[in-house]
Curated annotation (Swiss-Prot):
Gene3D superfamilies reported for this sequence: Leucine-rich Repeat Variant (1.25.10.10)
Protein name, per record: Minor tail protein Gp26
InterPro entries, A to Z: ARM-like (IPR011989), ARM-type_fold (IPR016024)
Source organism of this protein record: Mycobacterium phage D29 (Mycobacteriophage D29)
Length: 837
């Protein structure tokens, strides 16, 4: 069918299209080359104020336009590099690192700064909590560690003070004897007061003790029984042995603690000594705290703050105590009602927790192992990243501190302005508030007065509606329950049928499983046959390509006619550098006209060549037809090729093993040589000399075909034959390793071709070769159409014969007979397709 890209003439299509893939490759190569050769560092000072940054950028662009309007005198060297497209100015102004991207870079920098601020301020609550935890983690750990480190020295200091007091107790007693007369007088006076006041009290207690004596005797009897029970256990039998064992083990424990106490004491003394040396560092903050505390106490006691605080504390304490009394009373009342439900809740929660204990234990074990391993693996990573984190923190701290210092005055001015505006607005609104409150009060009173008489009536009406709806519930329930009761017997009648269906399906499973296995085996055989047929089809196409060699030779003459035109183009391009200077002054006027002429010339050229291309295509098609009929000695290619297609599948099985086996052997030998070279450290380039990536790909395809054949043989071996399956699996592993070696070498060669030779290719030669690809594309399209006419592609005779696949038609009387016939057919087909192993 004709379209915008071609014109159909009979059965031959002529298509003229640009080689965009080659253009993209050239463009990518040029851009990469420019990046390697030309680079510039553009300092960008990002202003946090977006408006200021835009204004600076506009001012810079105006200066650039002014300088550009004055004009410049650019010296052009005639001996330019032909491989570089565009001059220095074009690369400077239009390249990726040129001045033309300065505005984009500045805009991007401003956008990134704004995005950083938004991202920093838009953190979620959880993120801020995480940031806070991270921020206080290190100081908190350091504070705790410092306190723990200073604790031994503080304990030593207090212990030393207590020891000194104990040692000087005799002196303290001797000094206290001077106050003994006064102390004795005070004791006598106080004792007299107690004696006078407590004598009646103790007389009453004497009578009480007389009354309580029998009860106290009962308590003493209980205590005696407790002591007897304890003594009976520890003085005889297992109890005595256990007590002896406890004492022995305790003695051993104390004996073993000797080195521990020695080492611990030494460490404690060392730490205490270091702390004592650092006591001087603590005096200054303690003195400062004491002075500040004294000043604070003087202030709050003199200005009435302390008295007000005590009054507020008394009020708060009174409220708390009253609330405690009320809560206790209400709690006791609630406990009397909630005893049973709370007991049920506690028992249920306990049962649930006990049932969940195995699962919770497993989860805890999982989390412990995973998190522990994660921490162990992350520790060296964090250690390696610590210098980077430290540098980043210092850099961010410096940057943020500078930014905040710069923003502080600005924000202060903004806050003062907003404060003044808000104060003025609130002062203006303040006189209006009493009027608004009075208006709302009058409105509410009016609403209550107007709607008050009707609210009880509305409530009564709603109550009647709810009562009527509730009365419908018994009717609905009495109607639905019999209906459900009627459905239950019908549903129950379905249960036996469902049980029979399940039982029947269970009985069918032993029969269905072998059938499914048969289907899987058939699918594997079809896939194997399809892969083999595809390999044969490639060989047939290669033979047909030989028939088309004459056609390609004719096209080669046409390609040769282009060489003189390409040489002229190359000579003309060589003269271009000398003309650049004269053209550059008036570039703006002639570029548009030149572009129009180029496009119009391309259109005219394509139009003038259409008729010639059609004539040439007819001539080539006639040559192809005559070459085929002359080569085969026939006059009806369709009939002969139809017969060839009928016998292709029959001859394929005979020639497959002989034609395909050498390719496999060559691929294996090449992979073995490459493996030896890689193991010995020898450069494999000498082994791959003369071998292209296409040939390596063909070798990989041959090895893949061999792997599939061995896989089919392995699947045919019973699982009980472990030795045979292991031997075939070893062959499969070896073929996989050989394929990996060939794939690696193919990728290496391809990368060398792409990245080593790309920089040295002449773009003009590539453009000329792209133009010369047109006749080759024409030949490919003609050959593909010719194959379609022969019935080899699409819905042709040979393709139909190939895609028919393999069918099994059985005339059987039992499933066992079908399985036996299927096994015999598969064995025959495997021998005819892949040969004997």
């Amino acid at each position: 069918m004709p379209n915008s890209a071609g014109v159909e003439v009979a059965r031959i299509s002529v298509k003229v299209s640009p080689n965009t893939k080659e253009f993209r490759r050239e463009l990518k190569t040029d851009l990469e080359k420019i990046e390697r050769e030309l680079s510039a560092d553009v300092p960008v000072n990002a202003d946090l104020n977006a408006a200021q940054a835009k204004a600076d950028f506009k001012r810079l662009m105006m200066q650039l336009k002014t300088e550009a309007a004055r004009g410049v005198n650019i010296p052009v060297d005639v001996n330019v590099d032909k491989d570089t497209k565009g001059g220095f100015l074009s690369r400077l102004l239009g390249g990726k690192k040129g001045l033309s991207s300065l505005g984009d870079d500045a805009a991007k920098a401003s956008s990134q700064v704004q995005h950083l601020g938004k991202s920093f301020l838009d953190l979620t609550r959880t993120a801020w909590i995480g940031v806070g935890i991270v921020a206080i983690a290190a100081p908190l750990v350091g504070l705790v560690a410092g306190l723990l480190a200073g604790l031994p020295s503080l304990l030593s200091a207090f212990g030393a003070g207590a020891g000194v007091v104990a040692l000087g107790m005799d002196g303290i007693k001797a000094a206290a004897e001077t106050m003994m007369p006064a102390l004795e007088a005070a004791k006598t006076a106080v004792s007299s007061t107690f004696q006078t006041g407590l004598t009646p009290v103790f007389q009453q207690l004497g009578g009480l003790l007389t009354t309580l004596t029998p009860n106290l005797q009962n308590v003493a009897t209980g205590i005696v029984n407790i002591a007897k029970g304890f003594t009976d256990v520890v003085s005889q039998g297992p109890g005595l042995q256990q007590l002896q064992n406890i004492l022995d083990r305790t003695g051993e424990f104390f004996t073993g603690l000797g080195p521990v106490i020695s080492t611990g004491t030494q460490a404690f003394l060392t730490l205490s000594n270091a702390g004592a040396n650092a006591f001087g560092h603590l005096l200054a903050p303690l003195q400062e705290f004491a002075n500040g505390f004294n000043d604070m106490v003087n202030r709050v006691t003199s200005n009435g703050v302390f008295d007000g605080a005590m009054q507020g504390l008394s009020q708060t304490l009174g409220s708390i105590l009253n609330l405690f009394n009320r809560l206790m009373e209400s709690g006791l009342q609630a406990m009397g009602q909630l005893g049973g439900p709370l007991s049920t809740l506690v028992n249920g929660i306990g049962d649930l927790f006990i049932a969940l204990m195995p699962a919770l234990t497993s989860v805890s074990s999982l989390l412990g192992n995973v998190l522990g391993t994660l921490g162990t693996q992350l520790a060296p990573i964090i250690t390696a990243l610590t210098p980077a984190f430290t540098t980043l923190a210092d850099t961010l701290g410096t940057m943020l501190t500078g930014a905040l210092q710069a923003l502080g005055p600005v924000l202060t001015v903004v806050a003062e302005t907003l404060g003044t505006a808000l104060t003025t607005a609130l002062q203006a609104i303040q006189p209006m508030l009493p009027t608004l409150v009075d208006s709302f009060k009058q409105l509410s009173e009016t609403l209550v007065t107007s709607l008050g008489p009707y609210l009880p009536q509305i409530g009564e009406a709603f109550g009647q509606i709810v009562g009527a709806v509730i009365q419908l519930a018994p009717t609905i329930i009495s109607s639905l329950i019999p209906a459900f009761q009627t459905l239950i017997p019908a549903i129950a009648q379905l249960a036996p049928s469902l049980v029979q269906i399940v039982q029947a399906f269970t009985k069918l499973m032993p029969v269905i499983v072998p059938v499914v296995q048969i289907v899987i085996n058939l699918a594997a055989a079809v896939v194997q046959a399809g892969a083999s047929i595809a390999s044969f089809l490639i060989g047939g196409i290669s033979r047909l390509v030989g028939v088309l060699a004459d056609c390609v030779g004719a096209v080669a003459e046409w390609v040769g006619s282009w060489s003189s035109g390409v040489q002229q183009v190359s000579d003309f391009v060589g003269q271009l550098p000398g003309k650049i200077k004269s053209w550059f002054d008036d570039a703006g006027s002639w570029l548009i006209e030149a572009g129009k002429n180029v496009v119009q010339g391309l259109i005219n050229g394509i139009g003038s060549m259409i008729s010639s291309a059609v004539s040439k295509a007819k001539e080539l098609a006639s040559s192809v037809k005559n070459a085929v009929t002359g080569f085969l000695g026939i006059h009806s290619p369709s009939r002969v090729f139809a017969e060839i297609g009928q016998f292709t599948a029959e001859g394929f099985g005979n020639g497959f093993e002989e034609g395909f086996q050498p390719v496999i052997e060559k691929a294996k030998a090449l992979a073995a040589e490459l493996s030896q070279a890689m193991e010995s450290g020898v450069d494999p380039s000498g082994i791959l000399a003369g071998i292209s990536t296409k040939e390596l790909k063909q070798y990989s395809a041959a090895l893949e075909q061999e792997r599939k054949r061995i896989q089919v043989e392995k699947n045919a071996i019973p699982k009980e034959d472990k030795a045979g399956r292991a031997a075939l699996q070893a062959q499969l592993d070896q073929i996989k390793a050989q394929k990996d070696i060939l794939a690696y070498q193919r990728d290496r060669i391809k990368n060398e071709e792409d990245y080593v030779g790309a920089a040295g290719d002449d773009p003009l030669v590539k453009a000329a070769s792209g133009l010369m690809n047109a006749p080759v594309d024409f030949a490919k399209a003609t050959g593909k159409q010719f194959l379609t006419d022969l019935g080899i592609s699409g819905d042709g005779a040979i393709s139909k014969a190939i895609t028919e696949g393999i069918q099994y038609i059985f005339q059987i009387g039992s499933v066992d007979e079908a399985l036996s016939i299927k096994d015999r057919e598969e064995s025959k087909n495997a021998l005819s397709v892949v040969g004997r192993a």
